[in-house]
């Protein structure tokens, strides 16, 4: 936590009985009954401008009557399985930055630097953060135009970390962090297009591997443009 108590100490994260779980497996909001401690508006924004981003300040100027930021009590609700916590302990004494900070060596599972010493280590903690092992999700994307119009694009995303594969062997080094697949399901002019990515740990040794399947052409091509700040699929360059 911090000195004034506005950020509490971490006590292990959200308990398994923190709220009810519905038939689809979703946890109910355990903080649903909480009320904001205060609300930032265009009238009092100057009191908090040192804690707001330029984008937030711009929103208050553009929409002074409607844009508000309710501020709630801070909760340290994040938690990970015990095996991930143990891996982080091992990483603390074994993992090293290589290739000028562009890769990792002797890394296992997640959180290579539990006690980060510089910005690069913080970035790698974010890149390798635990995200549940494997995930399948449905995504709806809207890219608004200046006039307010938009076209919805629907995706099926799936990704899995190498450590979640059945044949994973921690004693067998691999340069792959996770595998990602994205399939467009609508609109019809884009439906069937597929993106496949092998995300690598050391991208100097082996750059990210990506392929695109174009349903209209029925061809698979390598996709080196899927890197760094390359635009997201069907986002008109806005994401």
Please place each PLM-identified region on the residue numbering:
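Acidic, serine/threonine- and glycine-rich low-complexity intrinsically disordered segments
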Residues: 194-239
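Solvent-exposed N-terminal domain segments of exported/luminal and surface proteins
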Residues: 1-207
């Amino acid at each position: 936590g911090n000195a004034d108590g506005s950020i509490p100490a971490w006590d292990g994260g959200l308990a398994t009985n923190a709220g009810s779980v519905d038939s689809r497996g979703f946890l109910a909001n355990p903080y649903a009954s909480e009320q904001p401690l205060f609300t930032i508006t265009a009238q009092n924004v100057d009191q908090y401008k040192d804690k707001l981003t330029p984008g937030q300040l711009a929103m208050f100027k553009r929409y002074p009557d409607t844009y508000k930021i309710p501020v709630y009590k801070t909760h340290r609700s994040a938690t990970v399985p015990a095996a991930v916590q143990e891996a982080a302990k091992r990483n603390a004494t074994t993992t090293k930055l290589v290739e000028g900070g562009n890769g990792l060596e002797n890394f296992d599972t997640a959180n290579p630097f539990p006690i980060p010493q510089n910005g690069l280590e913080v970035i790698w903690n974010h890149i390798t953060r635990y995200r549940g092992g494997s995930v399948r999700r449905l995504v709806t994307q809207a890219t608004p135009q200046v006039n307010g119009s938009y076209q919805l694009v629907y995706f099926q995303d799936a990704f899995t970390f190498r450590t979640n594969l059945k044949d994973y062997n921690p004693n067998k080094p691999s340069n792959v962090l996770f595998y990602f697949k994205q399939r467009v399901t609508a609109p019809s002019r884009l439906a069937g297009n597929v993106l496949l990515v092998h995300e690598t740990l050391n991208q100097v040794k082996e750059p990210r591997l990506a392929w695109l399947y174009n349903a209209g052409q029925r061809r698979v091509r390598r996709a080196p443009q899927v890197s760094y700040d390359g635009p997201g699929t069907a986002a008109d360059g806005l994401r």
